[in-house]
Each structure stands twice: as structure tokens, then as C-alpha cells.
Amino acid sequence: MKVAVIGAAGGIGQALALLLKNRLPAGSDLALYDIAPVTPGVAADLSHIPTHVSIKGYAGEDPTPALEGADVVLISAGVARKPGMDRADLFNVNAGIVKSLAERIAVVCPNACIGIITNPVNTTVPIAAEVLKKAGVYDKRKLFGVTTLDVIRSETFVAELKGQDPGEVRVPVIGGHSGVTILPLLSQVEGVEFSDEEIAALTKRIQNAGTEVVEAKAGGGSATLSMGQAACRFGLALVKALQGEEVIEYAYVEGNGEHASFFAQPVKLGKEGVEEILPYGELSDFEKAALDGMLETLNSDIQIGVDFVK
């Protein structure tokens, strides 16, 4: 099993690589790529950790050596948010990066499962899809926007508010991966009750959690460590699924188009990627209104990505 981390010298990439070096199954290969010359050094540093995961680092303009033979590709390359920026401000730089990486993946490892972390995810995933379609290698079962951070934040914040064990809390999160498009289904959290005020405040906090970290870091970065943890959780889920385990995770995928062509929802993962898109259950009136209210934004985000590749 080979996992490639693209953008491995960045804050998310280094955190993700550290976690994967410790947690991938024994015998796995971990490839790190970044345009930054430090990347082989990141791999050298991590290679001193005593686990049965081989690691190599590659720098420069061409990600091909890292991508060759990859089963899973996790893309965190791009610029990070700074105070005053929203995820859309990242588009101008990150769209081109994701497009060029998808073009290489289409040639080098077209059968890999691809997890896109690079923001704005609502838009970068459709960009990758359009590139892969043009190359004739698109498989919607194998392209994912990683929204796991919204899930782990929701689990953490609910556990804090209600005095629960965060490892036991399960919160479905649907929609997209920015602002109002992030919709935690708090009505479905088992074993806890929320007041209307708590639901409104908690939903807003989950939607704005990225901004909370950007502002707290005061210009020194964005949510890199928690995102590394979230990406590791999703990456390991893909690895387990490819090895034959049945795994359920939330991800931003091309679905049946009921609300938008791409939508974050629960998926059953298997050896070919998405085996089944699962229903997300009944919504409360608050959640129905929030879903209706986000769709224009989400569909617009998707269209921007499609148009970028035309």
C-alpha cells in the first residue's frame, strides 16, 4: 500500500506525514512531495521514527516519482488562509495548483483514490473531476473532498458542551466545506438534547471554526494540526477500505445530484473507493432551512470549479 502526501512540507502536510508514519499499516510506503526543497529533509527526519513504514521525500517541479504506484493520494498543496481571508480568496492560487496536480495524477496513477484537502474544497474537487474527465480517467468513486475536520470539530464541540467522551460522540456533517455550506446534523446526535439556542450557536461555531483558529494564530497560519489529524483519519479509512474492510466516513463526493453535483454525506468505502452513498436521515426544521439556504452558495462554488477547467 502506497500513500502519497502532496504538499508535504506545509503545516498540514508535515502533521499528516508524522501521523501516517506512526499509524499506517506495517509494510506501507509513504511518499512525500512538495515543491519546497526541504521535503527530502522532512522525510529524513520522519525516517528516524521506528515504525515499519518506509518513507521517501521528493522536491521540485515534478511530483511524478511520489505519485508512481500510489494507491492513495492526499493533496494539501497550496497557500493557507490568513486573517481577513476566506476560503474563496485562496481560489486564485490553489485552483491552478490542484489543476496541474490532477493532470499529473491522470497520467501517473489514474486508479488512485484521491483525497483533496486544498481549499476551497467546494471548488477544488470539481476542478480535479473536470481534469480527470478530460483525460478520460475520471472515476467518481475515487475522488473525495476531505471534510473530516468538520466532523471532528463537531464531535469535540458537542462533547465539550455536554460533558461527553469525544471519542464516543458521533455527529453527521453534510453539505460542503466552508461557512454556511457546513451543516452539522445536531438533531441526530444520540444521547444528548440541545436547546434551540445551543443548536444555533453550535452550528455557527462549527461553521466558523477555521476562522477561529486563523484569528487565534494571528497571522501565523491556519488550522494545520487538527487538519492533519482529520486527513490522517480519512486517509487511514481509505487504506482500510482498499484492504477489504468496510468503512463508513463522511466526504464531499459526486453523488446523485439531489442537492448539488458534489455534496458531503456519509459514504460506505470499499476496495474501489465509494461503494455506496448512504442516506443521512431525517432533518429538523432548522436543518432543512439551513440546507435550503446553503445550496445557492454550494452550487455556485461547484460551477466556479467547472468553469475554471473549461
Curated annotation (Swiss-Prot):
GO MF, any single term: L-malate dehydrogenase (NAD+) activity
Enzyme nomenclature, EC number: 1.1.1.37
GO CC terms in record: cytoplasm
UniProt entry keywords in alphabetical sequence: NAD, Oxidoreductase, Tricarboxylic acid cycle
Disulfide-bond pairs as recorded: none
TM helices/strands, residue ranges: none
A biological process from GO: malate metabolic process
Catalytic activity reported: (S)-malate + NAD(+) = oxaloacetate + NADH + H(+)
Domain of life from the UniProt record: Bacteria
Cross-referenced PROSITE patterns: MDH (PS00068)
Binding site for NAD(+): G7, A8, A9, G10, G11, I12, G13, D34, N94, I117, T118, N119, M227
Active-site residue list: H177 (proton acceptor)
UniProt binding sites for substrate: R81, R87, N119, R153
Top-level EC class: oxidoreductase
UniProt similarity note: Belongs to the LDH/MDH superfamily. MDH type 1 family.
PANTHER family assigned to the protein according to its UniProt record, in alphabetical order: MALATE AND LACTATE DEHYDROGENASE (PTHR11540), MALATE DEHYDROGENASE, MITOCHONDRIAL (PTHR11540:SF16)
Function noted in UniProt: Catalyzes the reversible oxidation of malate to oxaloacetate.
Assembly and oligomerization: Homodimer.
Name of the protein described by the UniProt record: Malate dehydrogenase
Organism: Vibrio vulnificus (strain CMCP6)
